[in-house]
UniProtKB/Swiss-Prot annotation:
HAMAP family linked to this entry: DltA
Family of this protein: Belongs to the ATP-dependent AMP-binding enzyme family. DltA subfamily.
Record's keyword terms, sorted: ATP-binding, Cytoplasm, Ligase, Nucleotide-binding
Binding site for D-alanine: D189, V293, K473
Enzyme's top EC category: ligase
Transmembrane segments: none
Pfam families cross-referenced by the UniProt entry: AMP-binding, AMP-binding_C
Protein known as: D-alanine--D-alanyl carrier protein ligase
InterPro entries: AA_adenyl_dom, AMP-bd_C, AMP-bd_C_sf, AMP-dep_synth/lig_dom, ANL_N_sf, DltA, DltA-like
Taxon lineage: Bacteria, Bacillati, Bacillota, Bacilli, Bacillales
Species for this entry: Staphylococcus aureus (strain NCTC 8325 / PS 47)
Length: 485
């Protein structure tokens, strides 16, 4: 495996003025990225705890990542948009020695020695630093939601990141020194899919401003100003962008590669993208945070669309061996698997196994292997029981999306006394709803040919678009709040 830091330094030495990172009007060249990260690494040197990387989309967040990797301590990205109580939970769990605050704000909850961008810019520390990171060191820890309300810190090993990056570069058909687009916040591991493959191939990482997440017109302006070659995002974010009629190959001929991860890629969205960008390479990938971003991939073509009404997630990558339990739960084994949850032995023991030096992770996803392809069939914890029948909400959503009247759909269970009493479908219709009763009848008639009566939602709520979280995923919680009043 090729060391990522060495690749970055070699490219910076050969192309010092090439742009490494761009966010709106802020840019850093490769030389600046390596110099500034070395100055930060000098300050972190010797630390045995991960550095808290605090902020939002900005080039200096990348400086923080590379600096922490060089120092060998790794980093924990914390987004400023999350609630203060959650920030405190993460800080208390990490107990950091150092915090790199890339914002102009000060936060009382930040503990440890705090560095700012200005501290690094004005530092007299040397701009040369020999990387200290080892293959078995934790390179980053990303906190995900926990069922108890306490976030879980997923620890990823440096060797796992290097292996993932090499795999991404093998998939990449666009070549080196490309313009990459990253939509995901740094606290969401989808960002890893853009950051390291981009920089390891001498590309320019273009960061989508958080204000663009629910405003495709602003993104349109960005794409017009900067010809993007490779787009990394969630399917939900892409679906929102497809509302722009100008998002097509004729308008944006430079866009020749797409990577999707983080959610199921709906057939209709993939079909629209293939139609609009017939020359582009489009990848559907799958993977949990606990297995280093993604463990499978498939190139979506017209042939694949014709063959599969529900898209597969493809075949496993190096470092990931997939299997299922008797109940159909997907299990991942190999180098890609996380080192476990930070300071949470109980939760780690529930889903990880490290016997005989082999790491395995029970994903909680239902899956099947068919015709040489892996298919994700929803979450085990998205199962509900209604009138004695056990069912998968995502199965109902998949069938809804196949209706000619439905563009996007989420199914929300309605509870009474902790019991599901009926289902409501949140629907983005393909046409304006002028007759509520007629549209409801049409959709239900569509479903009756594919689902038993007990799985059909009692009623539907019409939405212009489904709200997204800051990560660009569908915000199920917000939809439920809207529906339940």
């Amino acid at each position: 495996m090729t060391d990522i830091i060495n690749k970055l330094q070699a490219f910076a030495d050969a192309n010092p003025q090439s742009i490494a990172v761009r966010h709106t009007t802020d840019e850093l060249t490769y030389q600046q990225l390596m110099d500034e990260s070395s100055k930060l690494a000098h300050r972190l040197q010797g630390s045995k705890k991960p550095m808290i990387l605090f902020g939002h989309m900005s080039p200096y967040m990348i400086v923080g990542m590379i600096g922490a990797i060089k120092a060998g301590c790794g980093y924990v990205p914390v987004d400023t948009s999350i609630p203060e109580d959650r920030i405190k939970m993460i800080i208390n769990k990490v107990q950091p020695e150092f915090v790199f605050n890339t914002t102009d704000e000060s936060f009382e909850s930040l503990e440890g020695e705090v560095f700012t961008i200005e501290d690094i810019k004005t530092s007299q520390d040397p701009v040369i630093f020999d990387s200290q990171i080892k293959d078995n060191d934790t390179v980053y820890t990303i906190f995900t939601s926990g069922s108890t309300g306490e976030p879980k810190g997923v620890q990823i090993e440096y060797a796992s990141l290097v292996q993932f990056t090499e795999w991404m570069l093998e998939l990449n058909k666009s070549g080196n020194e490309q313009q990459w687009l990253n939509q995901a916040p740094f606290s969401f591991d989808l960002s890893v899919m853009a950051i390291y493959p981009c920089l390891a191939s001498g590309g320019t990482l273009n960061l989508v401003d958080k204000n663009m997440i629910n405003k495709p017109k602003l993104l349109n302006e960005m794409l017009t100003a900067t010809p993007i070659n490779i787009w990394v995002s969630t399917p939900s974010f892409m679906e929102m962008c497809l509302l722009l009629p100008t998002l097509n190959e004729e308008q944006y001929g430079s866009l020749n590669e797409f990577f999707f991860c983080g959610e199921i890629l709906p057939h209709r969205a993939a079909k629209a993208l293939v139609n609009r960008f017939p020359s582009a390479t489009i990848y559907n990938t799958y993977g949990p945070t606990e297995a280093t971003v993604a463990v499978t991939s498939i190139q979506i073509t017209q042939e694949i669309l014709d063959q599969y009404p529900t898209l597969p997630v493809g075949v496993e990558r190096p470092g990931a061996r997939l299997s299922t339990t008797d109940e159909g739960e997907l299990v991942i084994e190999g180098q890609s698997v996380s080192l476990g949850y930070l300071k949470n032995d109980q939760k780690t023991a529930e889903v990880f196994n490290f016997d005989d030096g082999i790491r395995t992770y029970h994903t909680g996803d239902k899956a099947k292997f068919e015709n040489g392809q892996w298919f994700i069939q929803g979450r085990i914890d998205f199962q509900i029981k209604l009138n004695g029948y056990r069912m998968e909400l995502e199965e109902i959503e998949t069938q809804l999306r196949q209706s000619e009247f439905v563009k996007e759909a989420i199914v929300v269970p309605v509870y009474k006394n902790d019991k599901v009493i009926h289902l409501i479908g949140a629907i983005v219709p393909t046409t304006e709803v002028t007759d509520n009763a007629e549209m409801t009848k049409n959709i239900k008639n569509d479903l009756k040919s594919r689902l038993p009566e007990y799985m059909i939602p009692r009623k539907f709520e019409w939405m212009e678009q489904l709200p997204l979280t800051s990560n660009g995923k569908i915000d199920r919680k917000k939809i439920a709040e809207v529906i339940n009043g």
